[in-house]
Amino acid sequence: MQKVGDRLSKYDIVNEVFDAIGEIAQKSDFISAGLKGQDVYALCKQGYLERVKKGYYKLAVGDEPKEELILSKLMTHGVVCVESALFYYGYSDFAPREWSIAVPRSYSRTVKAIQAEVPVKAYYVQNPMYHIGETTGPFNGVTLPVYDRERTICDCFKYRT
């Protein structure tokens, strides 16, 4: 990537960052490309960038990022579980309206912040149990952590109402 002084406009730098990173970029990505924090703020105010969450941005015009991509960028500690995992493994033909995500108990603020972007049902898990059965899988072209089949079935019995 080129720096601002190399005759690139701020808009060109932003477009290069999104070409390199994807549909959602962090403020640090723009800063390492040569923009200043106040430039990012000004681009948001002009309507060129849109703030997804503190420190995360997307282009204001264009396609909305996939829910899977938003989850992978903004909920780095979330694991797909229960209804969403059942659908992923083909145990259910019912596509859930909201993502079932397991998070450590200390991440309640993170979940509340992301619920404005993606419908999420959070399952708060104790830290010793959180990583048991964790694996990864492709969701619509994006790799997300998901609990394995055995953990999914056990969690369904645990959380049934």
Where are each of the predicted segments found?
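A short, conserved structural fragment
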Residues: 47-54
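Short amphipathic alpha-helical interaction segments
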Residues: 31-45
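Helix-start/capping segments and mature chain N-termini
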Residues: 1, 20-21, 33-34, 148
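A detector for short, charged/polar N-terminal pre-domain segments
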Residues: 2-20
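Nucleic-acid-binding surface
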Residues: 9-13, 24-29, 44, 56-161
